[in-house]
């Protein structure tokens, strides 16, 4: 962005209302260039943002934010919105530590009406905001902008049903429509679409409804008959359009890159006093030929070379890739294995499986709850379903994990990708809750691999079990093999790495924290403090006697975990040791018994964590290698211990 560019002069959405259409075209070109430059450098969501520039400008030309609220579904297509609402000077910090979020964030701007990150939530949120405005005597309009992909989520249709029933003036803009929504048919339907938003038609409709409704005794009944007749007529020309069936007016399709047309339709839509769906067709990746040709490759992308679109090469394999390879290897030997994803085939590493075993691959769409119950159904029919799902999206299916899977003790395997801190995407995408959510669930087993070989061993072991099993792993490079962790899997037992016979400090960790712990252990050794490492392998169940036997020779135990501290495995293990020490010495000498061991837990504290690199998030959360070193040294030198009141005696399921 240059000093004298149009974009540099846009301080807020009101400024774009002063521009001519020629200036708007120039502004769109500048915005495309800025998005391409910043995403090329920082990484981010490219194709979707390049496709909604004109739509975003048109929305802000017609409506007045923040008086009128715009809710962006998922939110990854909000870059233009951010730039024209006073954040263009900081746009270069997009997705960087302490920089702009890649998603709408109320804490960032009054123009961000609602925080989003997960799909299919916008219509529900927008409807709630609209009702809140009405109750507060606020006349502002509310617009939900949702992509056709997010329309595969059931929550979107729940909200449409509710909105149609309430008959409030909610505006839903569907971007693209390449899924399953039928196009209108014939010239008359196009006329009807134009007529629906014409001001004269709307005034006539209002006066007619009012006049008919005022007829004594039969007015309301007549209105009801006319309303049903109108819906029936629309159904003929809209081929059973689902939005009409929900009680919405329906407008479109509209060219999403023609700002004159967009503004004209939006101005008419703004005057409606009933819910309306406006279908806008856009080109994903618009203006960047490589993204137009292959929008999927440029949906979410790391830093790349703009000239050829190539991402910086990294020879290391990721945990996602390691999982994909291991699953294909297992499926080649076992025809019962099926793979399920919730619209994240590539992101979860299932593309190779899909190409090799298309009849055993299932994409449930953005419907995590359905995906889990579908997998449970497969398991009940004798299959071995593996549901690959991001940790952050697993949260959306907890009821199905408990009700449909675990109560029946069905052998569904959950491959939980992006467990632990997730770089760049912020609070809505952190994978910090899965252990705390799944540990209390009866019949559930949770494993945490630290390497490619260990992941393969765990998957092979899981496929031989008859209960629900979760295998959680981070969004990170995956070590090929850690020799100590290549031994066979024993239920509830981890692996001890002894660095010295004289070690008095033990550091326990989940697989995703092993590299940080290993680095910390090396630093401590250099400082003359020897530590041993215990890779827990299992977050559940825990072989308590085995674990207590491992820890009995250590005076200082530090528990490290890539999840929330509240409800953590580490807190459970700490309570197990404290309970054991208390019982060992007897209730009369409880305090003396606890002094035999000093313990501490390093995990993510009770807050939401922002975007940044994994190392920046580790440091910000106080669980980096440096913090582990400090905690171990403090534990070794302090004279006090954790009080008994902090330990919750929990019985392992």
UniProtKB/Swiss-Prot annotation:
It comes from the Bacteria. Keywords: Isoprene biosynthesis, Magnesium, Metal-binding, Thiamine biosynthesis, Thiamine pyrophosphate, Transferase. The keyword Transferase applies. Its cofactor is Mg(2+); thiamine diphosphate. Gene3D superfamilies: 3.40.50.920, 3.40.50.970. Its EC number is 2.2.1.7. Mg(2+) binds at residues 148, 177. One of its GO terms (molecular function) is magnesium ion binding. Pathway: Metabolic intermediate biosynthesis; 1-deoxy-D-xylulose 5-phosphate biosynthesis; 1-deoxy-D-xylulose 5-phosphate from D-glyceraldehyde 3-phosphate and pyruvate: step 1/1. One of its GO terms (biological process) is isopentenyl diphosphate biosynthetic process, methylerythritol 4-phosphate pathway. Binds 1 Mg(2+) ion per subunit. Binds 1 thiamine pyrophosphate per subunit. It catalyses: D-glyceraldehyde 3-phosphate + pyruvate + H(+) = 1-deoxy-D-xylulose 5-phosphate + CO2. Thiamine diphosphate binds at residues 76, 117-119, 149-150, 177, 288, 368. Catalyzes the acyloin condensation reaction between C atoms 2 and 3 of pyruvate and glyceraldehyde 3-phosphate to yield 1-deoxy-D-xylulose-5-phosphate (DXP). NCBIfam families: dxs (TIGR00204), PRK05444.2-2 (NF003933). Homodimer. Belongs to the transketolase family. DXPS subfamily. This is 1-deoxy-D-xylulose-5-phosphate synthase. It comes from Treponema denticola (strain ATCC 35405 / DSM 14222 / CIP 103919 / JCM 8153 / KCTC 15104).
